[in-house]
């Protein structure tokens, strides 16, 4: 536009100003007419120029009209379809003019002008507007404080959103090289707003470890120390933030002054300003991640602990945000209180003797390990208050949690007198904080707490009768944290004294009349289910009666937690639920929900996940419900795939949530596991065939869809191979990239590896052409030091299974993988998967007996540790052991200890 400068048409400006004015009218008819005109005005090519003109130049208009024009401008820029390069020339007038808005006497205009600037930069990058940074930095030298504040309103947002982009060269110069020294200088400005903003900007570059900041890090630290007692709480907050950030990325700079910094943070965590206190409290969380520095906190623990306890007491503001504590079970949830639903996806993990009694895995730890590889951890949240932001109470509890994990008994000795004082307080808020503190130290101080639990348990159970819902809520959480102790009691007398009352108490809380208590009770009960497992079987009738009643009583939000409790129960007690009395109690409320939710409602996700676990647990007890469940599930699965395909060619069609694929695939898996080989007639009706659908889902761009597709594939191989056989070669082609290092999504790769092993058992000799490409990838994963433990277990099992029918193809490669294979396989729990893997390995050895010369000691050790092999495997072990004695003239080549030799002699007579 340089050759054709924009010419303003006064009449258009006047008319647009009038329309904006009318859009703010209290008269709804006038307002709606104006809003319609503004919608049509979006077609005007130079609309943004007119809006800029009204925002910046039309000082004769009211601030409300100018600010409305600015907001329209910002939104237009945010959703603009302009491309970088020549397409951005239409913003030239806006870019050259909006800067002046930062000098406007009206704070609102300055703020909106800054928002427009930062929106342009965040949308297209600093490189498309390089001159803006020198202009903004120059404005910081203005004698007018309003101009400086205006410049910083833009700079703070730019530094926050674009720190990484700023930390590189533009045309041979690095912006931060001149920005950071100036920010450090301005951090001592007489205006507290300028000091606050300067520090805020500097803090953004600590986190990204900018070398431009590190060049001035000592000066930066000196500045922080100088501002530590600033009169402005916002400055003090940013000082605390700077020290916490430095603790994370440059602990070497914190260490020399640690004592002074600890004293400062002790003081600041008790600051009357909650924002300062919260930022300072983050220090105690951060220092626990630095063992060398945390070990120096010993002399300060007697100050830190009571300070954190005080921070855990509900403030008046906390209670105000929480609202009333009346019985509210019959009050309908607001839409904004309900979290969006997302599918979890199932991971196939090796079956051990502990943990969930389902095909889905051996223990929660294994499943959690896979999830940790694929996603971020959630924050510590002591009572899961979705209605409250991260605050001093939660931060204090989290800090106590991590510090107790580091200091253990030392911290327990310090906190016990304070806990006694809190728990016996007549102030319910102090008492409640004491209960929270006991829960917070559960993980770190469990060993030391055990001696006090017989006394504490009855006290906590009595608090479940408190008139204060918040006390009942936190007591549920804390009891959940210590439920393992009650679940592991051996004597029947102790179980009747502690475990049964705990079970009864939590079940009462599950059906409490307060929604927050229901939520906490249900969550704590789900934890108890995990800890107690099969020990709950004698109590299934009262458990299911309560859960069924809860389905009738709960509003929408808590029903989601209830699904999780039912799912966990099914996972941990398994086929014990397959009883007519239990099935009716369990299935009736689930089918009621099933009938109420439409096919396109995301509220189906948790219901489908729950039903999948219930189906697996009920086994043939689920048969009466299988046909109807499968028909609807398959319909949703097929329709979702159709809509995804249609949306690729038709932009008017909304792309459906792929979680519909994840949950339907998982529910079909559950039905297959429930019915076993009896499922084939049901699946045979599928149109298109399930094999084709798995093939499509196995190539999906969303890894969770691939993860569930491979889980279903493995289940079909196990129970109804005839339905999947025609598609095996095509599926194996798509499976190979999932096993290529680096594994882009661990859970999807894990399930692909597991399903390949299941397929190998079914295909037999027809697997031959796939053995080499699979083995190449599996050996690479097996030898990778960074591989996930669960993945490695499935790799070892699948390699072994490749040898069941095709040992001659695996045998030549034995030397490449035997060592890590033995190391991994001996950690796998004894089950059919491990047994089949070892049978395959024995076949491989039979094809390459020379390998005994280098692997015999490891083989002998694994055999000695294998307690209950199948009869077939025991026979194979015996023959190899006997053969090795004959081949090497005795047992010396075993290099075994006397204990191992005795074990082999006892088991195999060799």
Curated annotation (Swiss-Prot):
One of its GO terms (cellular component) is cytoplasm. Disruption phenotype: Severely impaired growth at 32 degrees Celsius. Residues 34-122 form the Importin N-terminal domain. InterPro entries: ARM-like (IPR011989), ARM-type_fold (IPR016024), Importin_beta (IPR040122). Its main location: cytoplasm. GO terms for molecular function: GTP binding; nuclear import signal receptor activity; nuclear localization sequence binding. HEAT repeats lie at residues 12-39, 44-82, 93-126, 132-169, 177-207, 220-247, 259-286, 302-406, 414-442, 454-481, 499-532, 540-573, 581-619, 627-677, 690-721, 729-764, 772-807, 815-848, 857-888. Residues 333-381 are annotated as: Disordered. Keywords: Cytoplasm, mRNA transport, Nucleus, Protein transport, Repeat, Transport. Residues 366-381 have a biased composition (Acidic residues). It is found in: Cytoplasm; Nucleus envelope. Belongs to the importin beta family. Importin beta-2 subfamily. PANTHER family: IMPORTIN BETA. Functions in nuclear protein import as nuclear transport receptor. Serves as receptor for arginine/glycine-rich nuclear localization signals (rg-NLS) and PY-NLS in cargo substrates. Its predominant cargo substrate seems to be mRNA-binding proteins. Mediates docking of the importin/substrate complex to the nuclear pore complex (NPC) through binding to repeat-containing nucleoporins. The complex is subsequently translocated through the pore by an energy requiring, Ran-dependent mechanism. At the nucleoplasmic side of the NPC, GTP-Ran binding leads to release of the cargo. This is Importin subunit beta-2. It comes from Schizosaccharomyces pombe (strain 972 / ATCC 24843).
């Amino acid at each position: 536009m340089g050759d054709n400068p924009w010419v303003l048409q006064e009449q258009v400006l006047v008319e647009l100003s009038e329309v904006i004015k009318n859009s703010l009218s209290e008269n709804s008819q006038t307002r709606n007419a104006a809003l319609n005109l503004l919608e049509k005005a979006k077609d005007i090519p130079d609309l943004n120029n007119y809006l800029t003109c009204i925002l910046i130049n039309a000082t004769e208009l009211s601030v409300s009209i100018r600010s409305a024009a600015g907001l329209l401008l910002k939104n237009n820029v945010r959703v603009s379809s302009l491309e970088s390069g020549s397409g951005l020339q239409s913003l030239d007038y806006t870019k050259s003019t909006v800067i002046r808005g930062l000098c406007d006497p009206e704070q609102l205009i300055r703020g909106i002008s800054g928002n427009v600037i930062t929106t342009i930069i965040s949308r297209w990058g600093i490189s498309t507007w390089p001159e803006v940074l020198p202009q903004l930095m120059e404005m910081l030298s203005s004698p007018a404080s309003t101009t400086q504040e205006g410049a910083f309103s833009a700079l703070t947002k730019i530094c926050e959103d674009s720190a990484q982009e700023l930390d590189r060269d533009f045309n041979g110069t690095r912006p931060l090289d001149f920005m950071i020294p100036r920010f450090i200088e301005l951090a001592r400005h007489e205006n507290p707003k300028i000091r606050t903003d300067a520090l805020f900007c500097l803090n953004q570059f600590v986190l990204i470890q900018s070398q431009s900041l590190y060049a001035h890090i000592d000066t930066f630290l000196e500045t922080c120390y100088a501002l530590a007692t600033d009169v402005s709480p916002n400055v003090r907050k940013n000082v605390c933030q700077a020290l916490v950030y430095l603790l994370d990325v440059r602990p070497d700079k914190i260490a020399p002054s640690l004592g002074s910094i600890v004293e400062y943070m002790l003081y600041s965590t008790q600051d009357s300003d909650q924002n300062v206190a919260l930022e300072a409290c983050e220090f105690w969380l951060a220092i626990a991640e630095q063992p060398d520095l945390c070990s120096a906190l010993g002399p300060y623990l007697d100050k830190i602990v009571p300070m954190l306890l005080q921070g855990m007491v509900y403030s008046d503001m906390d209670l105000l945000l929480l609202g009333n504590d009346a019985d509210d079970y019959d009050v309908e949830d607001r839409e904004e209180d309900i979290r969006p639903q997302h599918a979890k996806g199932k991971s196939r993990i090796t079956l051990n003797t502990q943990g969930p009694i389902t095909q889905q895995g051996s223990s929660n730890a294994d499943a959690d390990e896979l999830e940790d590889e694929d996603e971020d951890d959630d924050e510590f949240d002591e009572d899961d208050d979705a209605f409250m932001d991260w605050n001093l109470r939660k931060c204090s509890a989290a800090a106590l949690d991590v510090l107790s994990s580091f200091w253990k008994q030392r911290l327990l000795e310090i906190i016990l007198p304070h806990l006694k004082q809190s728990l016996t307080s007549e102030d319910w808020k102090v008492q409640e904080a004491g209960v929270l503190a006991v829960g917070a130290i559960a993980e770190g101080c469990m060993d030391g707490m055990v001696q006090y639990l017989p006394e504490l348990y009855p006290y906590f159970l009595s608090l479940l009768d408190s008139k204060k819902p918040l006390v009942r809520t936190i007591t549920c959480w804390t009891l959940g944290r210590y439920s393992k102790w009650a679940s592991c009691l051996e004597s029947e007398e102790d179980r009747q004294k502690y475990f049964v009352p705990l079970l009864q108490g939590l079940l009462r809380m599950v059906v409490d009349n307060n929604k927050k208590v229901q939520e906490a009770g249900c969550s704590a009960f789900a934890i108890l289910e995990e800890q107690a497992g099969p020990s709950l079987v004698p109590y299934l009738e009262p458990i299911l009666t309560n859960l069924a009643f809860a389905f009738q009583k709960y509003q929408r939000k808590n029903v989601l937690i209830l699904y999780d409790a039912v799912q966990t129960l099914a996972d941990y007690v398994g086929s014990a639920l397959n009883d007519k009395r239990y099935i009716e109690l369990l299935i009736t409320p689930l089918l009621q929900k099933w009938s109420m939710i439409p096919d396109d409602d995301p509220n189906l996700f948790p219901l489908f996940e729950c039903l999948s676990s219930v189906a697996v647990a009920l086994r043939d007890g689920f048969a009466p419900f299988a046909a109807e469940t499968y028909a609807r599930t398959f319909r949703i699965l097929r329709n979702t795939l159709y809509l995804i395909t249609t949306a690729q060619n038709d932009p008017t069609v909304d792309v459906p949530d792929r979680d519909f694929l994840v949950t339907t695939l998982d529910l079909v898996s559950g039905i297959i596991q429930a019915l076993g080989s009896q499922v084939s007639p049901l699946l045979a009706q599928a149109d298109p065939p399930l094999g084709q659908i798995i093939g499509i889902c196995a190539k999906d761009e969303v890894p969770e869809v691939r993860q569930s597709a491979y889980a279903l594939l493995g289940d079909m191989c196990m129970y109804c191979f005839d339905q999947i056989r025609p598609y095996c070669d095509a599926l194996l082609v798509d499976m190979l990239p999932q096993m290529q290092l680096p594994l882009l999504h661990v859970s999807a790769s894990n399930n692909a590896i597991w399903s390949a092993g299941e397929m190998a058992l079914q295909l037999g000799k027809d697997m031959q052409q796939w053995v080499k490409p699979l083995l190449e990838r599996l050996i690479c994963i097996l030898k990778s030091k960074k591989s996930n433990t669960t993945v490695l277990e499935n790799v070892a099992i699948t390699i072994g299974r490749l040898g069941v029918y095709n040992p001659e193809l695996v045998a030549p490669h034995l030397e490449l993988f035997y060592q890590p294979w033995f190391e991994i396989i001996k950690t796998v729990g004894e089950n059919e998967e491990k047994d089949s893997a070892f049978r395959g390995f024995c076949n491989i050895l039979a094809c390459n007996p020379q390998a005994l010369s280098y692997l015999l000691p490891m083989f002998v050790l694994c055999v000695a540790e294998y307690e209950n092999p199948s009869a077939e495997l025991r026979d194979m072990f015996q023959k190899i052991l006997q053969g090795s004695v004959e081949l090497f003239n005795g047992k010396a080549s075993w290099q075994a200890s006397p204990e191992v030799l005795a074990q082999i002699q006892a088991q195999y007579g060799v």
